[in-house]
């Protein structure tokens, strides 16, 4: 469902629209998906600077806010931990052109303190830019704390 809503899968009946417009098929998509497993979607042949440049290059302050060390920009994805990759994945999705974020378990690879820091930063950016956000999570206390509305899906594979 997240891939459909973010425009990555388009073999279904109907349209996904944002602000009355269909999602673009080729250029930058204003709906960005933050994957649960960033190691599966990052090009292993690109250094992390290239991974960010594909979307945008945040300034040094934002890199620091997300706990990304500048030295990591010269590394390949396989040289970073899951938590470090997740920080890049989240930051990459926060392109200034992004209007809506779909966050699929975006903090599960992070320790508790970093989870709070990243979520606080993301929520602040989402509010300041007047963006929308869909959070997919099994962490119900987290969902209850940060979500305005909650929809529960049970056994969606059994449908």
Task: Name these PLM-found stretches.
Residues 90, 102, 118:
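Hydrophobic anchor residue at the start of the ABC signature
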Residues 116-129:
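Helical segment within the ABC ATPase nucleotide-binding domain
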Residues 76-80, 84:
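Conserved ABC ATPase signature
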